[in-house]
Amino acid sequence: MAGRVSGQDENALTIAGRRQNDSGRSEMPQGQQPNQFGRIFTPDEAWLARRSPEPILEPGLPIIDTHHHLWIRDGHRYLLDEYLADVATGHNLVSSVFLQCHSMYRADGPAEMRPIGETEFVNGIAAMSASGVFGTPRVASGIVGFADLTLGDRVEPILEAHIRAGGGRFRGVRDSGNYDADPIIGNGASEPQRYLRPEFRAGLARLTKLGLSLDAWAFFTQLDEVIDLARACPDANLIMGHCGGLLGYGPYAGKRDEVFAAWKARVTELAKCPNVSMKLGGMMMRLAAFDYLAMDAPPTSEELAAHWRPYIETCIAAFGPNRCLFESNFPVDKMGIGWAALWNAFKRIAAGASADEKTALFNGTARRVYRLT
């Protein structure tokens, strides 16, 4: 691939350096330089523009983006207009699923109820999109919010409040369990083994009772915990994020082959749980540690497909197209590639699939697992 992968050799993954002035590459604002993995940075639009637009592959193929965020964070605004500006660069997006990101929580009231503000906020965005004034895509036709499932039985009224606030769009919860003992790895969970706690499973039972799904998020080292959760709660609808949480920095740097083997074994075992689906994507430099930001320009779709193909094809082989669904993870993955090239890369990886398999991967599985019309 053009550019480089940071490390001692092309298979080694280490913490990347930042873009330098003397290379002619643009700098990001002070405090925003992408000088380490595991962090979210504001996308550098000038750097992204260094890659010429690509022709759109299979432009008529309907796409449901199963994982994106909407936020104003550290001065970075990514709301309906910004998302639709990316969408307008190509591909046939028909609808999308919003994933919780601690956006617009209520400023007061009981702490456990404050995340309802995010659902209220996104439902307003979704209503704007549903008006048709902003075009044909139906943004946030599914909403995945946050509720603390370790509240156990006490989480039910919170879930019911989300349902009321969601205007018929609320589909489930993401309660992240990703945790690593090394402090360099950014954790979403405040404690290890969150998914093994009896209180969490009691909360999941309440979620399942209400017909809602759980977006699970854990690192590949924790997939045994997700397997245990899926087996213990066979009626739960679990959707695993980001190809199963690959890591390639910190203690995992320079160990790509070792990590791949361990990840593949766990993903294959996870796929034996029929109540689990797998999202395909979310592997930009933040987690898998491909050092795209050290390149003079973003990768092409061919380059990205070459890097991601082993991971995505492994997931599809294990789960099958009817339990896999593509995701943009924007604006997080926009740190390393533009919208049009990202979806071109997914289409290149799926090029050998049948028409029915492509339908499942790009929209059909999403309609089923998120109960979208």
Model-derived segments and spans:
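Mid-to-C-terminal alpha-helical segments outside catalytic/metal-binding sites
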Residues: 12-14, 24-62, 78-86, 94-95, ...
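Active-site gating/metal-coordination segments in enzymes
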Residues: 31-51, 110-222, 228-231, 244, ...
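Catalytic pocket-lining loop regions of alpha/beta-barrel enzymes
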Residues: 33, 190-325, 336, 354
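Short, well-ordered coil/turn segments that N-cap beta-strands
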Residues: 59-62, 91-95, 135-142, 167-171, ...
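Histidine-centered catalytic micro-motifs
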Residues: 62-73, 240-243
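Conserved, mostly hydrophobic/aromatic
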Residues: 67, 96, 143, 207, ...
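Alpha-helical scaffold segments that flank or form the walls of functional sites
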Residues: 73-138
